[in-house]
């Protein structure tokens, strides 16, 4: 059986960073797999996890539970039966509702395959002070479904956010665990703790299944001879706009960082080619984290998520102007 953990968390909480940390510190003799779902369609998390050494399946452009769970079932079955991993980490979109996923993982058909362990919810406590986030049904249900709450980004904690966290915990913590971390440094031993929270979760009223699964199990890619493309996705009060550029497109380093910093959106995530190699960009609100490597990525991908109308055409125009002379 494959030890399995659901790693939830709202937009920008640090799920992918936490998973990368767990993968970097796992037993080298074990085979791990990651099933990742993103709200947008360009597959940024897949690009970030590509060098982790884990088996990887992506379900971009929506939610794992659409169409009676078919996209997730296909990805799950592929990883379990072909990959036969020792451990499986499942990362749903930050706008995802955990009930359908947990229902599927505990279905009788998966009893011989899955040993479901603790569900971790990665939380940025500052979101408890943000009315839009704190009132979001999926945000609340992610916290309600967790066995362990990981209060991430301790280095960014304010007295107000810590007080909000303690108030929430007194009202909702129960006998669950509350762990503090920064930069996604989650102790891997937490993954082997058992499920404790068996409370029945409500179905999500906000999550209608009327949207169409357009891309199946493949992240957006470029057709041959096409230099770049854009993709839009929307749902649950948010919009995502992402771009993919071919391997020969190189961006101005300072320009792309300023573009990402100033974009009037809540979330920016990307892996792009620059003259020095590649840059990974991760922005949530005003928090901007960048990381560079002196290797070129196979392509460039960047995605923005906004809770309000954004002028994607204007943002795209500015982005295209940041391309340097290509290497082709």
Swiss-Prot record:
Motif mapping: CXCC motif: 63-66
EC number(s) on file: 3.6.5.-
One function term, GO molecular function aspect: GTP binding
Annotated InterPro entries: CobW-like_C, CobW/HypB/UreG_nucleotide-bd, P-loop_NTPase, Zinc-reg_GTPase_activator
Phenotype of null mutants: Deletion of the gene increases the sensitivity of E.coli to the metal chelator EDTA and sensitivity to cadmium.
Catalytic activity: GTP + H2O = GDP + phosphate + H(+)
SMART domains listed in its UniProt record: CobW_C (SM00833)
CDD domains cross-referenced by the UniProt entry: CobW-like (cd03112)
Keywords, comma-separated and alphabetical: Chaperone, GTP-binding, Hydrolase, Metal-binding, Nucleotide-binding, Zinc
Pfam families with a match to the protein in the record: cobW, CobW_C
Domain CobW C-terminal, residue spans: 241-321
Description of activity control: GTPase activity is enhanced by Zn(2+) binding.
Gene Ontology, cellular component aspect: cytoplasm
Entries under SUPFAM superfamilies matching the protein: P-loop containing nucleoside triphosphate hydrolases (SSF52540)
Annotated binding of GTP, by residue: 9-17, 155
Enzyme class: hydrolase
Family, as annotated: Belongs to the SIMIBI class G3E GTPase family. ZNG1 subfamily.
Function: Zinc chaperone that directly transfers zinc cofactor to target proteins, thereby activating them. Zinc is transferred from the CXCC motif in the GTPase domain to the zinc binding site in target proteins in a process requiring GTP hydrolysis.
Quaternary assembly: Oligomerizes in the presence of Zn(2+).
Protein name: Zinc chaperone YeiR
Gene: yeiR
């Amino acid at each position: 059986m494959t030890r399995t953990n659901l790693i939830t968390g709202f937009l920008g909480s640090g799920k992918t960073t936490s998973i990368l940390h767990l993968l970097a510190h796992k037993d080298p003799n074990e085979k791990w797999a990651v099933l990742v779902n993103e709200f947008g369609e360009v597959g940024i998390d897949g690009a970030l996890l590509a060098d982790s050494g884990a088996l990887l399946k992506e379900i971009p452009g929506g939610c794992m539970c659409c169409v009676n769970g078919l996209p997730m079932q296909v990805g799950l079955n592929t990883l379990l039966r072909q990959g036969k991993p020792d451990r499986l980490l499942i990362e749903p979109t930050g706008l995802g509702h955990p009930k359908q996923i947990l229902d599927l993982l505990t279905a009788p058909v998966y009893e011989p395959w899955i040993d479901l362990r603790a569900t971790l919810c990665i939380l940025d406590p500052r979101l408890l002070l943000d009315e839009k986030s704190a009132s979001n049904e999926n945000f609340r249900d992610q916290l309600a479904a967790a066995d362990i709450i990981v209060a991430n980004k301790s280095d960014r904690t304010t007295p107000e956010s810590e007080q909000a966290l303690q108030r929430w915990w007194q009202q909702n913590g129960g006998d669950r665990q509350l762990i503090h971390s920064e930069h996604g440094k989650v102790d891997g031993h937490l993954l082997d703790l058992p499920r404790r929270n068996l409370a029945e979760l409500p179905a999500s009223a906000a999550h209608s299944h009327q949207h169409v699964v357009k891309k199946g199990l493949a992240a957006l890619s470029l057709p041959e001879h096409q230099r770049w493309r854009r993709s839009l996705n929307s749902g649950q009060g948010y919009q995502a706009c992402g771009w993919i550029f071919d391997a020969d497109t190189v961006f101005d380093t300072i320009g792309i960082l300023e573009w990402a910093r100033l974009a009037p959106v809540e979330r920016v995530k990307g892996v792009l080619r620059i003259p020095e190699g590649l840059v990974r960009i991760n922005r949530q609100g005003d928090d901007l984290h960048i990381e560079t490597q002196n290797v070129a990525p196979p392509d460039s991908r960047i995605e923005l998520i906004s809770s309000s109308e954004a002028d994607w055409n204007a943002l795209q125009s500015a982005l295209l102007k940041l391309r340097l002379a290509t290497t082709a």
